[in-house]
């Protein structure tokens, strides 16, 4: 487990987060640490996803603190590469973090379930 990860995410929870990202892919998703930091500071994100395998961890460490200060829920997934794939990015691209801005009605139940699990 990396230094920036506060708790170990069970595989079933990670899979639900990946499914949520995939379900929200048609909506507004911000990708990358800079964009995620901006929306977290503006308090406009519905949910933030951080990859556990980020190196160096300083790339995303501050995002958790901003989420805590602004009461934005966040969760972890094991892989940057798989996170990018689920978010509809090109093969070979990595995403250290992403923010779900709008949750479609069809995915709201998924988000509620993820929030209960984390």
Predicted regions and their residues:
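Helical mechanochemical/support elements of P-loop NTPase systems and associated helical scaffolds
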Residues: 9, 13, 32, 36, ...
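Structural signal for hydrophobic/aromatic residues that build the beta-strand cores
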Residues: 32, 48-50, 67
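A generic structural signal for short
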Residues: 25, 51-52
